[in-house]
């Protein structure tokens, strides 16, 4: 039975560099399932995160709002229950909504519109990872990134992250089977299942069978070598110091092994994606299901000597986005887009009036773009977390990228002429066009942001959370970490059930 609305499968991964997906996965990646998905997808070449860090990126992804609006500035900022997310919009429209995997919600609300959450999260839900602008330069050792992920890169058959993602995939597939059993029910609802993996996020450790795929890989060396600390821009210097770079001797072999493990973990994820699509196919739901593949932010992978994220360079800020399914014409789109566009796009595809969604989002629907009408709005990004001493903002429009922080010199890059972002045109304009472009971006920035107010809001949020966190660590502790609930008496075979009805209802397809 069809409801007239598409089912939706969102596959989200963590820290996947968008430069590796120029038109689907790069040729050298062993990713047959993602390559097959790309062939039938609308592919967005220049898609960007709203903020290059997990929790703010994901909160913005779900709401379609910038961090300055969600107030999820960092990995320990509470996500308020009153903020509408795509799960809320779809649920209002009659969808069943569920999450398997990571979303890094901070605070007592661990659902944010999802009716069901199949797993716990992999990261803490409390305020413990709060940075502190009052102490610039302080390195909080027990949770800040360090380069141990790079020097320790290699092979393992099980890790904390593998254990998590194996569970995420298993429970997601089980949920798809359960949903397929309802296909013939007159009262069934369309569904939106979000499956959110933590790979290929560091640590850079991969299973042997995927590691071996990249034995002869020619892409294990960064395009831009390590830039000395004193030649880096100020924010990159702060990132290096926050990652404790001076206490790690990162060798060329460490870099190669880290990148190899990262590529291997893309192949690991590809296998998981293949399992999900295979389940959709065998349960006859594929043709009625929209599939959206995305990442929260990227990873620098040693380019410029930088690792992880936390900046607006392409490796950190640019992320894959592919959408496949009924009504979606396959093709490559080059106009810059944003993860903020996902919520209005999902609403549009689900037949929800955008007038109901527009007040609650900073993004735009990509459906017109898929149908040939280009997106014209600039792409906005923000960062106000560890390694920053004041908020940073960025604007991507046309071939240009502009970066601003009140503490630092401005940056302007021409990404057509300088895709590796080696020439800052704000410092060395080539002529009047560059100067006029810089002036236009300054005006745009002033129109979009009150940087003093932004900074004050971040500082107030951090200070409040430090007070609350220290208090809650004294005495009895009530965790906010999500605990999935299962009713054992309603599973499998129990004496209060009609066993004949049970066996028939659990079978799908039936009568074959």
From Swiss-Prot:
Keywords, alphabetical: Calcium, Hydrolase, Metal-binding
Family listed: Belongs to the sulfatase family.
EC number, as in UniProt: 3.1.6.6
Positions of modified residues (3-oxoalanine (Cys)): 54
GO cellular component: cytoplasm
Cofactor: how and how many bound: Binds 1 Ca(2+) ion per subunit.
Name this polypeptide is given: Choline-sulfatase
Gene designation: betC
Pathways per UniProt: Amine and polyamine biosynthesis; choline biosynthesis; choline from choline sulfate: step 1/1
Gene Ontology molecular-function annotations: choline-sulfatase activity; metal ion binding
Post-translational modification: The conversion to 3-oxoalanine (also known as C-formylglycine, FGly), of a serine or cysteine residue in prokaryotes and of a cysteine residue in eukaryotes, is critical for catalytic activity.
Cofactor: Ca(2+)
Record lineage: Bacteria, Pseudomonadati, Pseudomonadota, Alphaproteobacteria, Hyphomicrobiales
Role played: Converts choline-O-sulfate into choline.
Cited PROSITE patterns: SULFATASE_1 (PS00523), SULFATASE_2 (PS00149)
Pfam families: Choline_sulf_C (PF12411), Sulfatase (PF00884)
Reaction(s) catalysed (UniProt annotation): choline sulfate + H2O = choline + sulfate + H(+)
